[in-house]
Structures are given as structure tokens and as C-alpha cells.
Amino acid sequence: MRKFLIISCLVLSFTYSQESPSFISGDANFYYISKLDGGGLIKLPYRILNLSWGHQHDQFQISSRFALEYKPQIDNYSFKMDNPQDFLLDLRELYMTWQLNFGEIRLGKQIQTWGFVDENSPLDNSSAYDYNFLFEAGTERKIASNSLAIDMYFNNFKIGPTTTPFHSINRLPSSFAEFPIELPVTPN
């Protein structure tokens, strides 16, 4: 709760400053997944609220994405989801961008996407996937990792090296989940 209050105060103080532009956007999702054969609810986690916030000052920008997630209580649901709460505030991204003449440098917890083929690219393995959100689109399925990324622009070309000290692994639903698709391999 204390972290939430500190983050809220920082967001409000940066948002209402006179000198630098800030933005806030988000959406609320009120939906559910039900079974076709009986109409019962499928107990999968989902994001009820998404919030994006950013603040720019000269060449520096700080960006963040928060999500309020509902996680059903199922025993041994997943090795990463062992929190006893139903609702969880998830800090999806928080990173700083330094914009330079030749490109930009980003440092922090961020979701990496590479090009237009983000959905199916075999090269796009810098951010892990959360298969509990398999039916979401784009970056909503990805897990952010602490990383340093540089985007350099040369005429019509873009070079983007990235490095991360800790690589996140894909998050798979366990065999106890009510996942509608059978996975070919499940972790022990």
C-alpha cells in the first residue's frame, strides 16, 4: 500500500507540472470467459484495468504501465502466481528514455518488441511470454524484463541492441488451471 501511495504522489506531481508534458491513458476491461458446454466460468487471470503514464523533460522521458489483475484462487495454479490475493497491482513497465541525436537509450523494466513481426518472429525472444494471457494481442502477452536497450538510426535503418542481466522465462499455466487449450509440454 505504501508503494502505491508513493507512486500515486509521484504521478500526480509530475502530471500537473507546468514546464514538462505528461500523459496518462488507460482502459478498463469488464469481460469473462465461459465454457460453451455449460456456461461455467473459466478461471483464468485477466487484467481488469490498464494504465499508462509518461513524463518528458527535455531529452529525458520516464514511462510506466500498470495493470490491476484478477487472479483466481486455485491450489498450485502456477509457480509464479502464489500470491493469496484475488486482485494484484502489477507494475508491467517502468523505464527511462534518453533521446539523443543518433537515437535513444532506454534503461529499466521494459517489454522489448522487435519490428512488425512481433507476433511470430523467431528473433523476438528478449521478452518472455505469459501464456495465461494467450488470447490477448501484442505486448499484452509479454513479461517485462530489466534491460538496457539502444535504438540507433542511420538513414532508413534502425539498429537496436539490447542486454538484460536477468532473463525471464515464459510463464505457463499449470495442469491445475482451467486452460482451454492443452499444452504439449508442462513444467514439473
PLM regions and their residue ranges:
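Surface-exposed beta-loop-beta
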Residues: 178-188
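Solvent-exposed loop/turn segments connecting transmembrane beta-strands
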Residues: 37-43, 140
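Short catalytic helix/loop segments, enriched in acidic residues and glycine
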Residues: 42-54
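Outer membrane beta-barrel
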Residues: 56, 60-179
